């Protein structure tokens, strides 16, 4: 069985990293794309008036491939801590983990629709990104709760 202190220490560092990921991810998204779907669309589709070149399929693929590995590994590592907690039910754990993976996949793939001039994918990108960040925040909150639940019980 895992010692309570060791679990709490590991969870503390994981929570700190999730928090850092949330803040830096939001900051980078806003800096790079902006807040509005129209800004996201212009970033990927390009705008000659503002000298913004359109992104290519190959360029998006070069970005997507490392994101697949990084994001899936991040979700796996943090969700793995969730499996050791008893704060929420198994069904809610399944829903949270599934929703994280689905929102990440949609976030990664939505620029492909934008470069082929489907403006709806700019909205999809924004919604998927904010959903992913919100769900990571929920995961952070649940793990934070689990830290106190576990230590108060032991």
Task: List each language-model region with its residue ranges.
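Perimembrane loop-to-helix junctions flanking transmembrane segments
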Residues: 38-55
């Amino acid at each position: 069985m895992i010692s309570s202190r060791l679990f709490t220490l590991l969870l503390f560092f994981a929570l700190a990293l999730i928090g850092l990921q949330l803040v830096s991810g939001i900051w980078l998204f806003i800096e790079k794309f902006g807040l509005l779907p129209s800004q996201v669309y212009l970033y990927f589709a390009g705008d000659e008036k503002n000298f913004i070149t359109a992104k290519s399929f190959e360029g998006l693929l070069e970005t997507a491939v490392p994101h697949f590995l990084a994001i899936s590994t991040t979700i796996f590592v943090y969700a793995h801590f969730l499996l050791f907690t008893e704060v929420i039910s198994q069904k809610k754990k399944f829903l949270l983990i599934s929703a994280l993976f689905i929102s990440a996949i949609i976030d990664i793939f939505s620029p492909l629709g934008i470069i082929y001039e489907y403006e709806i994918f700019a909205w999809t990108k924004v919604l998927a990104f904010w959903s992913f960040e919100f769900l990571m925040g929920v995961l952070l909150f649940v793990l934070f709760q689990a830290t106190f639940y576990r230590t108060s019980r032991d």
